[in-house]
Regions:
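Catalytic domains that recognize anionic headgroups
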Residues: 1-247
Length: 247
């Protein structure tokens, strides 16, 4: 299995001369996420020393990003590992930011589906605000910058007759596999990397069939050349080839 033998995306950027940072709003759990995250020059799990019941919002990650942006690094690569929309959904956003109501019932029961859906949708709105804030921070630097956002899974919320809930089914459902894949580029980046910008525009409507495209797209966005990069898997390459989705 290649994952045991090859270095991760953070090391690829580090070896290309980038200062690298990994910040997580989840607790370390001896997973590959921890292993690859700790390859960074700087890394931090902001919940690591907090009491188990502590609820830390993803916005705390932005403070760490702000420090990195102001530390004077010429080339910088940051990976943010958010808590996102994990259950319990209502704990993922401030109550005064709820867009959809009612969202007060949180027990994982089919009869509470309306409440659970509203709370889940509120987490998506909160993530939208997080990404907007992150983009604004990058814009203020006037630097050549790009951001890629995706999720490692979607969520079942009693969506069909199977009444599945969460995201750990033996056979993943449509709702677990369809996730966002978003790329933003600053004006300076678009001018400095016109090939990547044109490729992303060209591929924007094409489906992405697997998470391997995250790795190869980031290499392309960073202008990194390596024998491991496969342009056919990078949406930032004009050689990208869309593949059939599972659903």
């Amino acid at each position: 299995n290649r994952i045991y033998r090859e270095k991760g995306i953070i090391t690829a950027f580090k070896e290309a001369g980038f200062h690298t940072a990994f910040f997580s709003n989840q607790r370390p759990n001896h997973s590959f996420i921890d292993f690859f995250g700790m390859e960074a020059d700087e890394w931090k799990f902001i919940k690591e020393d907090a009491p188990e019941e502590t609820n830390i919002s993803d916005d705390e990650l932005l403070k760490l990003v702000d420090k990195q942006l102001n530390d004077g690094h010429r080339k910088l690569f940051i990976v943010l590992h958010m808590y996102g929309s994990h259950f319990n959904y209502k704990e993922r956003y401030p109550s005064d930011m709820a867009v959809f109501r009612p969202d007060s019932l949180t027990d994982a029961k089919y009869e509470n589906r309306e409440y659970l859906l509203n709370a889940y949708d509120n987490t998506i709105c909160y993530t939208d605000g997080f990404l907007a804030s992150l983009i604004e921070m990058l814009q203020r630097t006037n630097a050549s910058s790009a951001m890629l956002y995706t999720s490692d899974h979607g969520e079942d919320i009693f969506d069909d007759d199977r009444k599945l809930f969460l995201h750990a089914s033996p056979v993943p459902s449509y709702y677990q596999l369809h996730v966002p894949f978003l790329i933003w580029m600053s004006e300076a980046y678009r001018k400095g990397y016109p090939v990547q910008y044109e490729a992303v525009c060209m591929n924007r409507e094409k489906p992405v069939a697997g998470n391997a495209s995250v790795f190869h797209s980031m290499l392309s966005l960073g202008g990194i050349q390596t024998d491991y990069k496969e342009d056919s898997l990078s949406v930032a390459s004009k050689r990208y080839v869309s593949r059939p989705r599972y659903y």
